[in-house]
Amino acid sequence: MRLGLMVGYSGAHVSLDMDLIREAERVGFDSVWTAEAWGSDAVSPLAWIGAQTGTIRLGTAIMQLPARSPASTAMTAMTLDALSGGRFLLGLGTSGPQVVEGWHGVAFDKPLTWLREYVTIVRAILAREGPLTFEGTRYQIPYRGPGATGLGKPLKSILHGRKEIPIYTGSMAPRSQALSAEIADGLLLTCMHPERFDVIEPHLREGFAKASRPKSLATFDVAPTVACVIGDDLDACRLPLKMSLALYIGGMGAKDKNFYGEYIRRVGFEADAMRIQSLYLDGKRDQAVAAVPDTLVDALHLVGPVARIRDRFAAWKSLPIGTLIVGTQQIEAVRLLAELAQS
């Protein structure tokens, strides 16, 4: 099992802990991952990180589809991959309707079709097997719709990039997890309950059965994110994770379409998820945080004293996952997990 480091996205001010990233690279972490929401983007920080590291791979978790055309994403991927010596990992996702329509100003329409077409076009650009043409529901290349000049012509990338840049898709929902298993090289999960791998495994196998090439859990990179907070005070360690879970379960999505909350329900915390969301949407943020049960935090994350984390890590190590992406701000956590992964 490989380890990745999640640095996510910045808040009000751009911030990257390069000491933490360099230490992760030194102790053997395979990859570092950025994200984007409606502030800092996922790509610019990776260019900065790539210029100051030498071996750690550089992943996006995720680049939002509505933020860029497929061609723009392919150009970015090829360029950053070339500049970093073949270290780029392309993670893509639709995001949710609140961000797609509220931030990017485009329709959240047929997201699975959108993702399939997007990945197909990106792969075609990377492959450079001929000038790009595509006829789909969302994309038509060259464009011939309303307002077209008729002057567009099929083009092939000038840049000869790496054809096999790995493509991941991010998803917490069953149908898009199946699609990921079918069309992508890996699946990015915001969180995962290690004892409930059965909740996602059938969808992965469904996708493998439809793939154009043989695929299995042995070759497909399931890459969940787990937070790690080391400390003797369990309540203090859990608190920032409860705040994050309350945000995702309660506020990352609309009341009737919240992919994170729906996953938490599926792994056995239905009543808790409903209460957290209700409190959060009512503006009772502190109460929503308090409603996150200790058992949920302990199931999804690595928290507490070193001995406790050592014991809990075994559950993750026993799973058929290729990469465990660690969210932490502690250098001691980076060192501990590197030791545990290699033992």
Positions of the model-derived regions?
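Active-site-adjacent structural elements that line small-molecule/cofactor binding pockets in enzymes
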Residues: M1-S343
